[in-house]
Structures are given as C-alpha cells and as structure tokens.
C-alpha cells in the first residue's frame, strides 16, 4: 500500500512540474557618489530578482560596451538571483551611460539609462 501511495505522489509531482518560475530582472543604474563633471566616480548596474541565473549585463558609454567588473552571482531567499556590474568613470555632462540587460524572460534587451540627478 505504501508503495502505491509513493507512486501516486510521484506521478502527481511530475504532472505539476518542478521547474522554477521565471522572473524578469529589475535594473538599477546609479553612481557611487553624486555626479560632478570631471570628478572620477563609479558607475553601478544592480540587477536583481531574476531567474534563471543565466544573464548578460553590459555597461555602455554612448552605446559602446565598457570594461567592467562584476560581483559573484548570488541568490535571495526566494531563489531569485542578483548581480552587481560596475566600472570607474568620469562624468562630463556630455557622454550618456546606460546598462543593457539580456535575459531569457525579455523579448529584447532592456536598456536603463543612468540619471545623474538620482
């Protein structure tokens, strides 16, 4: 009898599926310090709440990829992931900075511009 119950439970689990829910990434772009033209700073792109963990994150200067460093991929209590990508930069009031995120939950890359006033 216990074997039958175990087989029924196993069958029910296979019907419901065990795959994790896919989650769309949340993107925040910000500088470490308030922006001052000509003063070195750090540009951060913090991407959180996404699943599955495979993701591509680029910081862009006038649409061109910048050389970046990144934190280790980490996960939250709800098993969603987060990652910080960052680089040093010197704002000048002319160049435009943004973060581009590509993830399986997105139909096209998500681009979030840095707002120097935030």
UniProtKB/Swiss-Prot annotation:
Keyword set, alphabetical order: Disulfide bond, Immunity, Immunoglobulin domain, MHC I, Secreted, Signal
Ig-like C1-type domain boundaries: 25-111
Residues of the signal peptide: 1-20
Gene Ontology terms: cellular component: extracellular region; MHC class I protein complex
Gene3D superfamilies per UniProt: Immunoglobulins
InterPro entries given in the database record: B2Microglobulin, Ig-like_dom, Ig-like_dom_sf, Ig-like_fold, Ig/MHC_CS, Ig_C1-set, MHC/Immunoglobulin
Entry annotated with the keyword Iron-sulfur: no
Keyword DNA-binding: no
Pfam families (UniProt xref): C1-set
Protein's cellular compartments: Secreted
Cross-referenced PROSITE patterns: IG_LIKE, IG_MHC
Domain of life: Eukaryota
Disulfide bonds: 45-99
GO BP terms, alphabetized: antigen processing and presentation of peptide antigen via MHC class I; immune response
CDD domains, A to Z: IgC1_beta2m
Family in the record: Belongs to the beta-2-microglobulin family.
Entries under PANTHER family matching the protein: BETA-2-MICROGLOBULIN (PTHR19944:SF62), MHC CLASS II-RELATED (PTHR19944)
Function text: Component of the class I major histocompatibility complex (MHC). Involved in the presentation of peptide antigens to the immune system.
Subunit structure: Heterodimer of an alpha chain and a beta chain. Beta-2-microglobulin is the beta-chain of major histocompatibility complex class I molecules.
Record's protein name: Beta-2-microglobulin
Organism, as annotated: Equus asinus
Source taxonomy: Eukaryota, Metazoa, Chordata, Craniata, Vertebrata
